[in-house]
Structure formats: C-alpha cells, structure tokens
Amino acid sequence: MSSIDRSQPVGVKTYEVRTYGCQMNVHDSERLSGLLEDAGYVRAPDGSDGDADVVVFNTCAVRENADNRLYGNLGRLAPMKTKRPGMQIAVGGCLAQKDRDTIVTKAPWVDVVFGTHNIGKLPVLLERARVQEEAQVEIAESLEAFPSTLPTRRESAYAAWVSISVGCNNTCTFCIVPALRGKEKDRRTGDILAEIEALVGEGVSEITLLGQNVNAYGSDIGDREAFSKLLRACGQIDGLERVRFTSPHPRDFTDDVIAAMAETPNVMPQLHMPMQSGSDTVLKAMRRSYRQDRYLGIIEKVRAAIPHAAITTDIIVGFPGETEEDFEQTMHAVREARFTQAFTFQYSKRPGTPAATMENQIPKEVVQARYERLVALQEEISWDENKKQVGRTLELMVAEGEGRKDGATHRLSGRAPDNRLVHFTKPDEEVRPGDVVTVEVTYAAPHHLLAEGPVLNVRRTRAGDAWEKRHIEKTAEAAKPAGVMLGLPKIGAPEPLPVATGSGCGCD
C-alpha cells in the first residue's frame, strides 16, 4: 500500500466511496458522499486504498460475478479492519438490496448494509453500528425520500447529473434492476428545473437528465408529453449550454421528443437508445415492447430531424434461444442503423430473472464467436462514420481525465456536441476543463478524433471558472475531484467489457 498522508484535524474522520455499475450508482455515490460530508466526514485522499475510516461499497447486481467481486474486495479489507478496530465498512446499492440476508453472514466484519431506497440513512446506521457494536442491516422496500433531496457532493465542477425519475415499470426478462429499485416515480418538474438553475448558478454548463427509463417521465402523472416539455424548458435556462439524457426506451420514444430535440438548441445532437437485439423473436422473448422496424423507424426520424446526430446503442449477444438467423437479424439492424458506437454484452444468467431459467441457453463458445463478429462489424462502421467528421469544425467542451495519453502527446481532450471524443493540440493560451475550444478535425480512428492543427478559438466560460476555483481551493480535507464529463455512455475507446446480463442498469 502506498504511503498516504492521513493528517486531519483531530476527531475528523475520513471516508471513501467505491462505485460499481451504472450512471444511477455514480449519481447515488455523489449523494452518499454529500451525506457523509454533511455528517462531518472528510473525503480521503485519492489512492487511499481502504485507508479511510469509513469505506462504502455502492454495488451493482447486473454484472456477472458481481457477488465474487464484492466479497473479494471485502476480504481484502478484513485485515485492515482487524488492525484498526474503529474502521467501518458499509455495503449499499443493488447487490445489497438483493442479498441483504447473506452479506453479513459471508463478511461478518461489515458494519452496515443498506439498500437502494434508503441511502439517506447511511450516517445514522454508521453511528448506530458504532454505538451498539453490531452490524446494522436496514433495507427499505419502497423509496423513503426522493434521492435528489439529499446532500450531494458533485464530482465535476462543469457537468452534472440531474435525476428526473427513479425506478422502472418495464419487465425485461434479462433485467433484475426494476425488482431492486422499484416502480417508476417521477420528480416534480419544478424541482428538476430549480436544481438545474442552481447548478448553472454554481458554474455548471452541461447537465444530463437521468432516469432508468428517462423518456417515460410523466407516466405517473398521466402526461405523455412531459419529457419533451422538460427538454424545451431546459432550453429556456440562461447559461445552460448542453443538455443530454439517458437512457430512453424505444417504446416511449415519441415524435414530440424528436421535435423537442431538434428545436431546442442546447439539447445535444446525440441519442443513446438501447436496441438489445435486432431479432423480433428475441425481442419478444426479452419482453421488449418494440420490434426491429419500430426501432429503425425511430432512428430514421431522428436523422431526418437532426442530420448530424450521433446514435449509440446497447446490444446483448447470445440471449437464450437466439438462433443464427436471429443473430443475423441483429447484424442486419446494425448495418442499417450505422451506430456511432455500440456497447455490446455477452448474455449470462442473472439469478432472479426470467431469462435465467429459459430453455436453450447458448453455449459459451457460440456466444463468444457471435460477439466477435458483431464487434468487428461495429468497429468498421464506427471508423467509417468517424471518417465523415474529418474536415469539420467542431466546438469542444474541454474535459478532464478523458485522454490517457494527453501528457505524453501534449494534447488536451474534449467532447463534441454529439459526445464524440476529440484529442486536440494544446494551445498556447491556457484552457481549463469546462472551457470551449473550436478545432478542425484532421484524423479519425474508430473511437476518437484528432484535431492536430492549431486551435481556432478559445472561449473561457463560467464552467471553466468554476473548475479553476475548485482546483485552487482543494485542500487536504477536499481531495482533487475526478472532474469527469458526466453524461451518456461515452463515444470513445470502450473499457474491456465483462460478460454481463445487459446494458448499464439493464432496464433501459
């Protein structure tokens, strides 16, 4: 373990939150951090590796072997806790909601287990575990308070998640998350807009509207056009430069949403819409309430209204019963759709889902072969689509931590309006994350673009000011924020993908 300077004011306790899974969990972890800081804890320095006084695991139940990963990480902390009796370990998130009765049995050194519906209880549960000297397991079966009413420690100074709903009313057969996060519950529009306006007042210039099934917003109040109205309302907020959303369901993707995207200047020309399969037979088995023609029809309408839109998707390969003909239908749909990028997953059983007990589970070697064919096809399409960007002039929002080789190549990185990742030559003039630069694209790779010429223009922004202020004011009590561009699944070189049951949370 590296040597960490843990010097803090006497009596001040540090915390670390480890996040696994989807965007919902990332945003929930911001809330967990806010709750702990509100209770007097201080964030541990980056790289503390379990050296904090409180370590919180915010877990995912979608990824294969999520259980093994959690217990492996918990096991590595057991010796540290033996040496430091005052240390506390908490486990929350979807896996905690699912395995509430087994976590403390398998890892008796865990102090707190909490679920997806009661994250606001974490500080109280930690204190109760300390006083009573026994593990506290508290799982709520329904939402106690809308999470966005809780304190939040934002990870980025210039971009932010804004939750508009929680839960999901869909019943996809591969997905366990609706059972863990509950039925859909929408926030009041006024509360959402008030949060966005407050964020913009703090310097944020990009927001991502977040929901398990984001474009179903309004379903519990009976307004089928509530989401498109919300997009248009975002367009009226001064200082808000970029609006994104994730993830929509094709069933609820209506013409009024497409019109709002096209007619609201700060709604970015980008759509991440999970297809999951191109086979009507498989889509029916998945209990997805659309078919290939419907999905491709939505894409056609989006491109007619927004010609330069970048469209990305999620696809599951090897769903139970998928034949070679079914897989060829997926390949056909990918050729027709010409996605900017596809996040492709190999199906694996997830206990508790209907698909796990379906007949005709596909052999691993068949799934792997199909996966490789699909990835190769999409790589070719991604590269072809990116080549069309060469010669275009783009406005990029400068990002922090997006380019792994920026230091060695003397480049910076940013996101185009359509969320493509662009590496550009570092200008003589200082630019900060959150600032906007204008560049000309000179080269295309499958997962990124290059702008190797001089930067054409630099626009310093309030978002850049906010990043600089936070950067300067960081102290030992407030470690440097990650500053990642929060938003949709990114268009860029993907991380190595583990076998999984579905995309993201699996219910979009």
Curated annotation (Swiss-Prot):
One Gene Ontology cellular component: cytosol
Chief subcellular location: cytoplasm
- Looking at the record, the residues that make up the MTTase N-terminal domain are 13-131
Location within or outside the cell: Cytoplasm
Give the UniProt keywords, A-Z.
4Fe-4S, Cytoplasm, Iron, Iron-sulfur, Metal-binding, S-adenosyl-L-methionine, Transferase, tRNA processing
Quote the CDD domains the UniProt record gives: Radical_SAM
Signal peptide span: none
Tell me which residues make up the Radical SAM core domain: 154-385
Which cofactor names does the annotation list?
[4Fe-4S] cluster
Q: Which reaction does it catalyse?
A: N(6)-dimethylallyladenosine(37) in tRNA + (sulfur carrier)-SH + AH2 + 2 S-adenosyl-L-methionine = 2-methylsulfanyl-N(6)-dimethylallyladenosine(37) in tRNA + (sulfur carrier)-H + 5'-deoxyadenosine + L-methionine + A + S-adenosyl-L-homocysteine + 2 H(+)
Q: Which residues form the TRAM domain?
A: 387-455
> SMART domains given for it?
Elp3 (SM00729)
What is this protein's function per UniProt? Answer: Catalyzes the methylthiolation of N6-(dimethylallyl)adenosine (i(6)A), leading to the formation of 2-methylthio-N6-(dimethylallyl)adenosine (ms(2)i(6)A) at position 37 in tRNAs that read codons beginning with uridine.
Annotated family: Belongs to the methylthiotransferase family. MiaB subfamily.
Task: Note the HAMAP family from the entry.
Answer: tRNA_metthiotr_MiaB
The subunit structure is: Monomer.
Name the record gives this protein: tRNA-2-methylthio-N(6)-dimethylallyladenosine synthase
